[in-house]
Regions:
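Conserved small-residue motifs centered on glycine
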Residues: 372, 376-496
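Helix-loop-helix "hinge/cap" segment bordering the ligand-binding cleft or interdomain interface
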Residues: 122-128, 152-154, 158-221, 236-295, ...
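Extracytoplasmic/periplasmic substrate-binding proteins
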Residues: 41-54, 163-165, 169-177, 184-190, ...
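General small-molecule cofactor/ligand-binding pocket signal
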Residues: 69-75, 269-270, 320-325
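Structured mid-domain segments that build the active-site/substrate or prosthetic-cofactor binding neighborhood
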Residues: 288-354, 358-415
């Protein structure tokens, strides 16, 4: 039944994405054309001992399907930002295609176009040369707006986490994990609301006084529990009005709860030191914590095996997950930690102005190649790899083979799949929920792919493409920096009890936020949102 539901959802998605005739791949109109493609080598490929994407079966499949040859250029590990800056400093020497997070370019994508680093794709799309991408843009207004600059320029062949917010597990990469065996021991249900979390953590503390009831990274602490108060930790949109949850009364209530949890030993006393990925994970893996919030892949795979090996849990099913914290049990959380459909922080592919100026067959081939990635054939190769090798069609459902799930060379699923596909990485692709349905092996991960979607945040998410006007950018940046510093300092003091959180203290805090210019920042965000929606 699960596969049938997933199949129906996937077919509906594919019908939307690929609502144009597929290219006749056998014609290969640009066979033999060679393109240069600058892209960061994904860490999963590094784990598979691959030094260039040309060594992958994915590339072999792309080359076979399109006839186009690609010379991949990879920046040195950890140097992609530096090398990107050097690359874009000399536009006349740019590779044909550059894959990067173009919102990170100084001044954003608009500046990259103005600086003649990349091109506006408006003419390409309007002329019908990118029919598969255009089909997505025509059918999905939110995506269409997100992948344009404030000036209305399309600028990338985007990395998309699906095309809808509904039942889309591609939008979630992390969630709660907890010891189900301890819940069973204490006769408790998996918590959903703040009150239920409070009861569970207190029961765990009483029964296991040497165990930390909850542990996670510093930055995630308020992102995962504020939704229990219908509060968001940043800018959001409600009925067309931009708001910021940091100064709402609901955030005050959240902070009071966190302060009580800290005082009563319910959260890690050293949580402020856990500032990067993996921090505190060892405590959970050693059985010294009851619950955590962590990455679906790296978190579970670095916690569950150690608990099993140490005999702290008898079966991996002893680890369980739950929905995003909600204010009303059984209802979707208003907010949650969730990615957008267009992940501007991920890398998407742009065509260099140099190549466009040269024109001719190479330029046409670059457009063809990148648009082909959104075709039915391109989608299947990007997400599943090669039929008969990395996956088989079973009752109409693309099912990964043991080459991916139980790799004979000992590669984990992420590394093995990286040899055949790109959909779980970045680039000009649309992710497919059917990948996540099979990608994870632990029952808590599989359940998380369903449970973590129980949120309505898609209705309130501030669009990533709504950029602050250039004239306001410096002032907005100053306000943002001041607010973040002040927020981090005071929230840490209140939660850890260094300062008492009273109504007077809270009111003074809100007043200082206003003095920093929060209302002005909200006005800037509102103007950007209005322009974005009107575009």
């Amino acid at each position: 039944m699960k596969k049938l539901v997933s199949l129906c959802l996937a077919l509906a998605m594919l019908a939307t994405i690929f609502a144009v005739p597929a290219f006749a791949a056998e014609d290969k109109p640009y066979a033999g054309v060679k393109l240069t493609y600058w892209v960061k080598l994904h860490e999963n490929l590094d784990a598979a001992k691959v030094t260039n994407m040309a060594q992958t079966r994915w590339y072999e499949a792309v080359k076979e399907a399109t006839g186009i040859e690609i010379e991949f250029i990879h920046p040195a590990a950890g140097q992609d930002g530096t090398e990107f800056n050097l690359l874009t400093a000399v536009p006349d020497e740019m590779p044909d295609i550059v894959e990067y997070s173009w919102t990170a370019y100084p001044g954003g994508a608009s500046a990259a176009i103005d600086d003649e680093v990349i091109i506006s794709l408006n003419d390409v799309i309007a002329s019908g040369k990118a029919p598969h991408l255009k089909a997505i843009l025509d059918n999905e207004v939110a995506i269409d707006k997100a992948v344009k600059t404030a000036d209305g320029d399309y600028y990338v062949f985007p990395f998309l986490r699906g095309t809808t917010f509904e039942d889309n597990n591609c939008l979630f990469t992390s969630g709660f994990y907890m010891r189900g065996d301890i819940l069973k021991e204490l006769g408790l249900e998996v918590p959903e609301t703040i009150d239920e979390w409070d009861a569970v953590l207190r029961a765990v503390k009483a029964a296991h006084p040497d165990m930390i009831p909850f542990i996670t990274r510093t930055e995630w602490m308020n992102q995962i529990f504020t939704p229990g108060y219908d509060n968001y930790w940043d800018y959001y949109v409600e009925d067309g009005v931009v708001k910021n949850g940091l100064v709402e009364d609901s955030h005050f209530e959240y902070l009071k709860k966190m302060a009580s949890w800290y005082a009563d030993g319910l959260i890690d006393p050293d949580y402020l030191t856990h500032t990067k990925a993996g921090d505190g994970r060892g405590i959970m893996a050693a059985g010294n914590a009851f619950a955590t919030y962590d990455a679906c892949g790296g978190g579970a795979s670095n916690i569950f095996p150690y608990l099993l090996e140490a005999g702290l849990i008898s079966d991996e099913s002893d680890m369980v997950t739950t929905v995003p914290v909600t204010s009303v049990k059984g209802q979707n959380a208003k907010f949650s930690k969730m990615n957008g459909l267009y992940d501007a922080s991920g890398s998407s592919a742009a065509i260099s102005k140099r190549l466009a100026d040269e024109g001719g067959e190479k330029f046409e081939a670059a457009v063809y190649l990148l648009d082909w990635m959104y075709s039915d054939e391109g989608h299947m190769i990007n997400c599943f790899g090669i039929e008969g090798e990395s996956y088989n069609m079973v009752d109409g459902y693309p099912t990964f083979t043991d080459v991916v799930l139980h790799n004979p060379d000992g590669l984990n699923v992420a590394a093995a799949l990286s040899l055949y596909a790109r959909g779980h990485q970045n680039g000009p692709v649309v992710q497919d929920t059917r990948v996540n349905d099979q990608y994870y092996s632990y029952s808590a991960q599989v359940a998380g792919m369903k449970l973590w979607t129980k949120t309505d945040f898609g209705k309130y998410m501030y669009p990533a493409g709504a950029a602050i006007a250039t004239d306001n950018a410096d002032d907005f940046a100053t306000i943002t920096a001041n607010i973040k510093t002040y927020k981090d300092e005071h929230e840490a003091k209140w939660i850890t009890g260094q300062e008492e959180l009273t109504e007077d203290a809270w009111n003074a805090y809100v007043a200082q936020m206003e003095a920093f210019g929060l209302s002005r920042a909200i006005q800037y965000k509102q103007a950007a949102y209005d322009a974005f929606m009107a575009n």
